[in-house]
Amino acid sequence: MGQETNMLNAHQQLVRTSSGRPGHDKRQQTPGTATGLLKLLSSTPYAEQRSLGSGDGVIHAQKQRSRSAGQTPKKDRRLRGRNKKGQSSAEAEDVVPSSPRKPSFPFQWAWESFTTDGRALHQPSSVLAPGHQALPLPLAVHHHKSRRKSTPALPEAHSFCWKTEEPNLERRQQLRACSCTSIPPGRGTSQELEPSGEGGLQSPRKSSGSGLEPEESEPEGLGAEEAERGLIPGELPQLPRRGLILEEEQFSEATEEAEDGEHRAPWRRRTSSRRKGRNSGEEAWEESEVRRLESVSSSTNLREPQRRKPRAKELEGPWDLEKLQRKLQQELDCGPEKQPWKSLRAAVQASNWSRKAHPLGDDETFLFANFPNRTFHKRQEATRNLLRAWELQQREEQQQAEVRRAREQRVQHQVARCLAAYAPRGSRGPGAAQRKLEELRRQERQRFVEYQAELQGIQHRVQARPYLFQQAMQANARLNVTRRFSQVLSALGLDEEQLLAKAGKRDMEGAPRRHRSHRSVGARMEPSSQSPPKMEPTGSQADQHFAPNPDQELSP
């Protein structure tokens, strides 16, 4: 058992050194690592060593290598899977040393040989070329390798292709068989995959120490890798296209997730059985909490109908604006030395507390006072906003009253100044304004009497001349007749002035009357009120005087 533990530790050390230092070649590793590899090779049974040349043996070795590489982190394996295209060319040649790659899934090399190099399936043989090995091997080494002659690569490649498509049932059965060994509790996650490694490392044979064993392991590992990939040692693999790379990465990720789930399934079963003991106490505590919360909720449901009634009363009390206004008026009437709003706020809060304390118990009132909830804060904020609005309204009313009083005083001062301007200089006593007012009233009465007298005179004049329109029509008719007479005289070639002079000699009184008839229309439209009846005889005399004159002139 101690020897198996030593071999297992050596196997873990080999995996860690190969995954931690990918830049070094296997030939440049420390002798301890080579010794560990030799122990691993020597620990395999003889039946497996005989079957190394066939495809099944290579697949079994590939499974062992994939299990050992399964301990590496998943992130590092994905990064190496993405960068594995640039590192896979120079491993087959001994001239250019390169780092060995760790497979990201069990059949990675077979998948690469199938996708990248199509010639691997159609070549007649991909046997290792004799004499191409870099280091000459002794007779013992050749004798040891003669037992393991490799078969042609064509059936190996076909077996790889068919093995990649078979389901994971065989791998699951192997992992379940390997995980039957007991895992001691308290070990880290890096040791979860150790039973699967132990199942493949158990063998009845023991390693025989010889000086040629470190040299044998290196070419043998290279030959196995070349046989697995199905490549000729002299040629380099071709890089696949981008679509093939993406398909390969997706397939590798799916295979890795399936492997991780299979490896962790037994450990999860054990951890779930261990957690059951812990969860039992937690479930009991949660059940007690649920019962307590249900009891509290039932008690609150019983108290809810008791709380709804006082809430309705609360909305009637503190929000009644009339009561608040009456309280405010009482505080204002008490005097300006008090602060009414502070006392009103205290009274409202006291009324709220008294109403809440009546329906609720003393304990709940104490809790409510010590632990105010969100509703309490909202109610307080609403009360403060209401009182603030009332204060603002009262201030506005006070300001308006002050402005109104100031306006009244200003108007009174203006009236006093106007009265003082009309008052005599000698009268500056207290009765001067009254005397000035009486004087103004007397003057107003006098002006009213004069206006009434003027209106009466106008009324008398209108009533004394009821035919004024007829008189105006008669004056217009006389003017038209005179104009027509002048036109007739001018048409006959008679001089109106000479004719009027001759007529005036006969009647001296008719000349001034005839001269008045030649006045303007405006002068005749303004008859004097003193002698209205003189107009008619004047017109009649003029007509009588003008009528015979043309007859007398035209008769000879």
From Swiss-Prot:
One of its GO terms (biological process) is cilium organization. Residues 387-463 form a coiled coil. The keyword Coiled coil applies. Residues 75-85, 266-278 have a biased composition (Basic residues). Residues 213-225, 246-260 have a biased composition (Acidic residues). The keyword Coiled coil applies. GO terms for cellular component: cytoskeleton; photoreceptor connecting cilium. It comes from the Eukaryota. Residues 1-102, 180-320, 503-556 are annotated as: Disordered. Residues 1-20, 527-543 have a biased composition (Polar residues). Keywords: Coiled coil. InterPro entries: FAM161 (IPR051655). Residues 304-320 have a biased composition (Basic and acidic residues). PANTHER family: PROTEIN FAM-161 (PTHR21501), TESTIS-SPECIFIC PROTEIN 10-INTERACTING PROTEIN (PTHR21501:SF5). This is Testis-specific protein 10-interacting protein. It comes from Bos taurus (Bovine).
